[in-house]
Amino acid sequence: MREVLLSECIDLLYESHFVISKPFGRSCFDLIAKKGNLRLLIKILKNIDSLSTEQSEELLNISKMLQAVPVIIGTRTRNSVMEEGAVYERYGIKAVTFNTFREQLVGEPPVVYANRGGFFVNIDGKVLRETREKLKISVGELAEVSRVSRKTIYKYEQNEANPSAEVAIKIEEYLDVPLIKGINIMDCIDGLKSQKSRDDAFEKILKEGEDFKIRVIDILGDMGFNLLETTKAPFDAVAEESKGEDAENQNIIFTNIQETENEEIRRKAMIVDEISKILNSHSLLVLEKKTNENKRITSMSISELEKIGDTVDLLDFIEKRKKSTK
């Protein structure tokens, strides 16, 4: 079921003129898609409650670094089938069905979101208050019609609470005015979780016996890169030299770190290189010792990395290596 859903998402994104990465398993996301300035990190799950806390934290952190929107596409929750046209949320990440995602891509956003206690909608509290006052309808009268308290109506008008879909429809019909607002699942999430400290990330990597990765990440950090270490992605770290808030002005290096090179490492590095091209960024494979040169992969030994002065020097090295292999 998951593989079918993944295939359908790939087809849909291509039809919608997105540039997408090849799918890869055992990651906090399955696809990266880009169209114009919109960047999506998509996770496909049959059961959206199977997303772990660790996966969600990493997905949010990578999204923040890449200025991308994380989206989960699934078919059910732990307890029930997901409703079409409704937005669910897991760990701050929006989750929808395939059909709801497709409708969003053609400009028809969902209007209902699932929360504890049922399904709710976002309404325009200002329009609600102005219309009620214009029609000289009291708060008490509207509360009685809607079968909610006066206090609740006040909260709706101040955008401090949202009604259920049923209550919102009653209010719209009584006032004869549209109030329900669509939910754009492609909006960037405000206040994405901050990255964990490097000490926390190092502690986890050390537990896994990854001393070599610690050495490489330390070197990159000393150069002046902002770093995000990962354990649930096809790359081991994201190094950022930011020149501003605009994603197009970022210099990002997706970094794979391995002591020895083998076919599996090369395959992963080529996938990461593809991701870097989609996002107009860079990829780098750092090894203990370089073996045979693979023209499709930009790689260097740790001894070469140690000789690099700063972020500018490393980016220049990568650019020159790219040009020499064309």
UniProtKB/Swiss-Prot annotation:
<dbReference type="GO" id="GO:0003700">
    <property type="term" value="F:DNA-binding transcription factor activity"/>
</dbReference>
<protein>
    <recommendedName>
        <fullName>Putative HTH-type transcriptional regulatory protein MMP0678</fullName>
    </recommendedName>
</protein>
<dbReference type="Pfam" id="PF01381">
    <property type="entry name" value="HTH_3"/>
</dbReference>
<feature type="DNA-binding region" description="H-T-H motif">
    <location>
        <begin position="139"/>
        <end position="158"/>
    </location>
</feature>
<dbReference type="InterPro" id="IPR001387">
    <property type="entry name" value="Cro/C1-type_HTH"/>
</dbReference>
<dbReference type="InterPro" id="IPR010982">
    <property type="entry name" value="Lambda_DNA-bd_dom_sf"/>
</dbReference>
<keyword id="KW-0804">Transcription</keyword>
<feature type="domain" description="HTH cro/C1-type">
    <location>
        <begin position="128"/>
        <end position="183"/>
    </location>
</feature>
<keyword id="KW-0238">DNA-binding</keyword>
<dbReference type="GO" id="GO:0003677">
    <property type="term" value="F:DNA binding"/>
</dbReference>
<keyword id="KW-0805">Transcription regulation</keyword>
<dbReference type="InterPro" id="IPR020886">
    <property type="entry name" value="Arc_TR_HTH"/>
</dbReference>
